[in-house]
């Protein structure tokens, strides 16, 4: 039994990590009649798994997702290549389709969140760029909470926030304005100013703050001490 006042949480990778990423879906035709059949089965596997976590007591499931950071970087790299840009857009569309199908019909008292991760190995990162190129896709995803990295300039401006929020009153955008990569602490007034700036674009009641990522996305962790983390 879960103690009163405790919300059991499970974090898992997003199904988008399997869709046209690092050749993980190259062999789909060996097992499925069509690409859509593959996506549907992937969505069902995730749906059933999340439901199982719920049945075991979880009431908060978060899907960690590096695909959107990857797409941000790729859209920028290929902006002068229409053919490649179209391929990237198709990946984004397939991601939205699969994720939403996986989330459909889950219990209403289950909170569904995602963290848009850009990499966090030894205080470095994999991807950079603003959310502008993927905002319209994020705005279609049926999550309750979006954790968005915003700890430095590599994440771009707050301009895409209204598109991501998409006038959904129940959706919360949690802004990762506190870095977990660097032991130096942020100026409190500067953080407050940033939240007020975001609140000019999205209602304050739909905003939250957090660290941009965890302290250790891998065994090695970031370049800071345990005491730095508690500070």
Where do the model's predicted regions map?
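Domain-level signal for soluble alpha/beta catalytic cores
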Residues: 1-231
């Amino acid at each position: 039994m879960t103690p009163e006042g405790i919300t059991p949480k499970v974090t898992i990778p997003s199904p988008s990590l399997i869709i046209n990423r690092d050749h993980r879906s190259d062999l789909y035709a060996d097992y499925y009649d069509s690409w859509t059949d593959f996506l549907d089965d992937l969505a069902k596997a995730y749906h059933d798994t999340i439901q199982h976590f719920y049945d075991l007591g979880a009431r908060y499931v978060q899907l960690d997702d590096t695909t959107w950071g990857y797409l941000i970087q790729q859209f920028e790299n290929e902006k002068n290549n229409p053919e490649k840009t179209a391929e990237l857009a198709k990946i984004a569309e397939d991601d939205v389709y699969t994720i939403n199908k996986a989330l459909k019909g889950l219990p209403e008292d289950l909170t569904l969140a995602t963290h848009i991760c850009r990499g966090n190995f030894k205080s470095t990162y994999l991807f950079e760029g603003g959310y502008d190129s993927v905002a319209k896709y994020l705005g279609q995803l049926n999550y309750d909470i979006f954790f968005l990295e915003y700890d430095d300039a590599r994440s771009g401006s707050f301009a895409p926030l209204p598109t991501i929020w998409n006038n959904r009153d129940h959706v919360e955008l949690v802004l990762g304005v506190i870095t977990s990569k660097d032991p130096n602490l942020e100026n409190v007034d500067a953080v407050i100013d940033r939240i007020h700036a975001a609140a000019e674009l999205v209602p304050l009641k739909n905003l939250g703050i957090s660290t941009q990522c965890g302290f250790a996305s891998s065994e090695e962790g970031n370049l800071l001490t345990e005491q730095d983390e508690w500070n």
